[in-house]
Curated annotation (Swiss-Prot):
Underlying gene: hemC
Keywords: Porphyrin biosynthesis, Transferase
Name of this protein: Porphobilinogen deaminase
Coiled-coil parts of chain: none
Keyword Secreted carried by entry: no
Domain of life: Bacteria
Catalysis performed (reactions): 4 porphobilinogen + H2O = hydroxymethylbilane + 4 NH4(+)
Cofactor: dipyrromethane
Disulfide bonds: none
Species lineage: Bacteria, Pseudomonadati, Pseudomonadota, Betaproteobacteria, Neisseriales
Length: 311
């Protein structure tokens, strides 16, 4: 099938537009006669910058306006960072493809310190993620963790203005924007296990658009899809959102998936970990199995306590 025109809905931040243009380029290469446009949009998540995401409704704030454009036909597909996509999509929407994953890890960015472990007592680290906060507080209790919102450029400017001694950002975003030079170190899994889907792009469509599944199929990366499916199944089983300090990271080797999961308290006092392996075709079941291990260790009670504190 050779489409004549496709419209991509995207947030207007530099990173989101890079992602949309990346998919635009892939589609133009696949379908040279197709006109591929980008519809830039401002979302509620882009507008609310004075509160942490966990307190204003979560990362779904970054996708609702894009979904409305899909629903009313202004756009054919929307490009998202998968880690920003709620675990349960609204009825009538579907993820048609998940692209090959870039760097899934977090990056340490500082103008003063080369490594996280070099930071002295009371040094201020910025992050908007409860997932990162829980892990950093557990491993580095001497550091002060403070909220950090805004797009990548805004966050870097806050660091450069001296509001923070260091900040933690997704490595993939910095690399996509050619800001690799700002990265002092990539955090290990033991320092900061990634969020479900981190580093991967997802393509969302209105579920009834059966014509698009075949069109977008070449953009899907099988291994990444299996890994992200396992990660999202884990998070979904535990009610994961950005209001919960939850991490899930899956790797694949010779068709075998290894999934690592984590649930913590934002103050770092409790961090639960679990892992398991399964063939790639059982990705969803693997996610649920690791979620059960975490639940058996008290993850649901911990998540309930965190949500009660947040509310």
């Amino acid at each position: 099938m050779n489409p004549k025109k496709l419209v991509i809905a995207s947030r207007e931040s530099l990173l989101a537009m890079w992602q949309a243009k990346h998919i635009q380029g892939r589609l133009k290469a696949l379908y040279p006669d197709c006109e591929v446009e980008i519809l830039g949009m401002t979302t509620r998540g882009d507008q609310i910058l004075d509160k942490t995401l966990s307190k204003v409704g979560g990362k779904g704030l970054f996708v609702k306006e894009l979904e409305q454009a899909l629903y009313d036909g202004r756009a054919d597909l929307a490009v998202h960072s998968i880690k920003d996509v709620p675990m349960d999509l609204p009825e009538g929407f579907a993820l048609a493809a998940i692209g090959e994953r870039a760097n899934p890890f977090d990056a340490f960015v500082s103008n003063q310190y080369a490594r996280l472990e070099e930071m002295p007592e009371g040094a201020v680290v910025g992050t908007s993620s409860l997932r990162r906060e829980a892990q950093l507080r557990a491993r580095y209790p001497h550091l002060l963790i403070k909220p950090l919102r805004g797009n990548v450029q805004t966050r870097l400017s806050k660091l450069d203005n001296g509001e923070y001694d260091a900040i933690i950002l997704a490595a993939a975003g910095l690399q996509r924007l050619k800001l690799d030079g700002r990265i002092r170190m990539i955090l290990s899994e033991s320092d900061s296990l990634p969020a479900a889907g981190q580093g991967a792009l997802g393509i969302e469509i209105a579920a009834h658009r059966e014509d698009l599944y075949e069109v977008l199929k070449p953009l899907n990366h099988g291994v990444t899809n299996a890994c992200v499916t396992a990660e999202r199944a884990l998070a979904r089983a535990l009610g994961g959102s950005c209001q919960v300090p939850l991490a899930a990271y899956c790797t694949e080797e010779n068709g075998l998936l290894t999934l690592r999961g984590l649930v913590g308290h934002p103050d770092g006092s409790v961090v639960l970990r679990a892992d398991a392996q399964a063939p790639a075709e059982y990705a969803d079941a693997l996610g649920r199995a690791v979620a059960k291990k975490l639940a058996d260790d008290g993850a649901r009670e911990l998540i309930g306590a965190v949500l009660n504190t947040e509310n």
